[in-house]
Amino acid sequence: MGEAAGDRVLSRLHSVRERIGDSLSAHPNELVAVFTRLVNLGKGMLQAHQIIAEYNNAISEADREKLKDGAFEDVLRSAQEGIVISPWVALAIRPRPGVWEYVRVNVSELAVELLTVPEYLQFKEQLVEEGTNNNFVLELDFEPFNASFPRPSLSKSIGNGVQFLNRHLSSKLFHDKESMYPLLNFLRAHNYKGMTMMLNDRIRSLSALQGALRKAEEHLSGLSADTPYSEFHHRFQELGLEKGWGDCAKRSQETIHLLLDLLEAPDPSTLEKFLGTIPMVFNVVIMSPHGYFAQANVLGYPDTGGQVVYILDQVRAMENEMLLRIKQQGLNITPRILIVTRLLPDATGTTCGQRLEKVLGTEHTHILRVPFRTENGIVRKWISRFEVWPYLETFTDDVAHEIAGELQANPDLIIGNYSDGNLVACLLAHKMGVTHCTIAHALEKTKYPNSDLYWKKFEDHYHFSCQFTTDLIAMNHADFIITSTFQEIAGNKDTVGQYESHMAFTMPGLYRVVHGIDVFDPKFNIVSPGADMSIYFPYSESRKRLTSLHPEIEELLYSEVDNNEHKFMLKDRNKPIIFSMARLDRVKNLTGLVELYGRNPRLQELVNLVVVCGDHGNPSKDKEEQAEFKKMFDLIEQYNLNGHIRWISAQMNRVRNGELYRYICDTKGAFVQPAFYEAFGLTVVESMTCGLPTFATAYGGPAEIIVNGVSGFHIDPYQGDKASALLVEFFEKCQEDPSHWTKISQGGLQRIEEKYTWKLYSERLMTLTGVYGFWKYVSNLERRETRRYLEMLYALKYRTMASTVPLAVEGEPSNK
């Protein structure tokens, strides 16, 4: 149900209970049939599609038309999950993103109850803890800490937090002269390693500041626009102004105008421009502990994929933006960016055992590796991202020491990546008092259905008790949160967002989250990344094409040799290629792609299939990858796909991968991303940037990247036959009309140009750091209560749970 439809339903009746009650009284026979079918499914959880399926089976189409008049179908279609404990059926109803209501229906008595969040969660817990006393359960509720701060209420405001925050700051903090003093103090506090910036001690009041600014403005008006700062810095110092206003007269004048305008008549746009202009970011630390973090020969290793690519592209763009801004601010400061990850002493063939490594394409950015350590010494083995929790506290202390040695100062911004990186970033930012940004990449709770309710079943392998607690701590501690898409935050009209799934949930026997996060919180900002344009560019740019790599690519795709690089063969080289490349894990669902291909003989007639994943020459020690590896072989044998499929080991060479995308374009093929859930979808952006028509999962970020039918296609990984039929339809249409392939290819390229570039990303990130850094400064006391609450959760829950995760047993050194 869309937002407009949701508003229509909400305005029609005042509450869920009244809407359902009205339908019950108007159509009791039909509704009894629906809920009786739900009860007959037996005790357990219901997914949204099950609820709708039973509704469609129970009620004829004619009767469903009648029910629409009573609004019951709208309500039922907005139910995201159900709980059956006879004779009760409880529903979690989501009229629109970020808005939830809970109801319980007694099928025997046709009684309807509206439930509070704790009541609904308590009822849910009965599925796993029948007969236990759950009246005294730890409930986590972060809502009181934010009660005094206004929130936007429209779904379209989600992910545009900085705009709302700017409006709030400009209206509340600057409504009179006294309220502007935090800005004055903020500017006076600016310094870098003892070097004063912006204002010196001569300016102690707002009137003195305004007077100095007007005199500086008058002085600058008599100079040519390109007069360097060095020629008027003495006059500035006499007035109380220090470095940082600009590198020349013109830029200094622009900054002064912004501040004068802000002091005279504050408005959100001027505030954002000013805070984005002043010098605030010189040292950045980016945390990404797990996996194999290096610049070559690691992609495709366990826990090593899009996040590594994202960060390496991110830091190159960030360094360029920092250098540009520092120059424009008239400062002679060398910025530093440190990517902090785990040192792996035995990762042969990679640089993962090297303490410090310069990032290629940068001047001032390095990978800093710090080992995991226990009382027995350095941990040498690779450790799954699900098992890092016992090491992170000691790791954080060691990282703090290493950062201090490298930077000789505190960082100005700490960015966490994924759950483990976000926890370390949170602990460091808390300790150092610096601005903290969170980037989740993927929140595991949404990948594994009901992994909160049945967490004990997952605990031995995944340790979700640690991970979900870590995620709650990090997202509530962060000064601002970056997501690549709206869907990451709040999903869409049909699916729940990653962060939204943390609003309310229960882990029976551990704690109950009645308010974990608010997706309307202005800390959320959508900042979409791009692809590296030097590697990923359109297939049509023939002068840039790396044709010298084509013999290697053709060997990779078509050689008849079976080896550790590639298995199985393609008999017909003239057919287009369906291509996919990802980690070999359950959620990425590459085995699902092979299965849908195997089940559709017509698709096999039309196209070949090439999948790039896993490592034939070095079997993984990751249990999930081992299972998917076996499943892949079994499916290829079951459907007799040899001759139609090529299974290539994970490819580490990004430059060649870029040309591989373009080579697939030459075959008039397509890229398919079949994940059950994908937070963003970097490979989707890469393939579209190369001009390759792309089919990608409807669950997560790709549904936002692709405009369905215009710049690519959405597929449902849970409905493989429909996905394969869509592929057949596309390739049959391309056979009839080759311009159809070109049309979709061009649509993808246009979408990328409009929305997904690293330059736009880095500009936005630097501006966000300025705005939220200022907000952190002026609201520090208000956030103290939240931080104390988080300290308690960390000390009393997380540390206890982390201590139960088994430590790695050191054996023979391993690369994977």
UniProtKB/Swiss-Prot annotation:
Annotated GO biological process: response to carbon dioxide; sucrose metabolic process
Catalytic activity: an NDP-alpha-D-glucose + D-fructose = a ribonucleoside 5'-diphosphate + sucrose + H(+)
Leader peptide range in chain numbering: none
Tissue: Expressed in root phloem and leaf mesophyll. Expressed in phloem tissues and aleurone layers of seeds and at lower levels in the pericarp and endosperm cells (at protein level). Predominantly expressed in elongating tissues including roots, developing leaves and internodes.
Database matches in InterPro entries: Glyco_trans_1, Sucrose_synth_GT-B1, Sucrose_synthase_pln/cyn, SUS_EPBD, SUS_N
Keywords annotated in UniProt: Glycosyltransferase, Transferase
Gene3D superfamilies in the record: 1.20.120.1230, 3.10.450.330, Glycogen Phosphorylase B
UniProt-recorded Gene Ontology molecular function terms: sucrose synthase activity
E.C. number: 2.4.1.13
Domain of life: Eukaryota
NCBIfam families in alphabetical order: sucr_synth
Function (record text): Sucrose-cleaving enzyme that provides UDP-glucose and fructose for various metabolic pathways.
Protein family membership: Belongs to the glycosyltransferase 1 family. Plant sucrose synthase subfamily.
Known partners and oligomeric status: Homotetramer or heterotetramer with SUS2.
UniProt name for this protein: Sucrose synthase 1
UniProt source species: Oryza sativa subsp. japonica (Rice)
The organism's taxonomic lineage, starting at the top: Eukaryota, Viridiplantae, Streptophyta, Embryophyta, Tracheophyta
Gene: SUS1
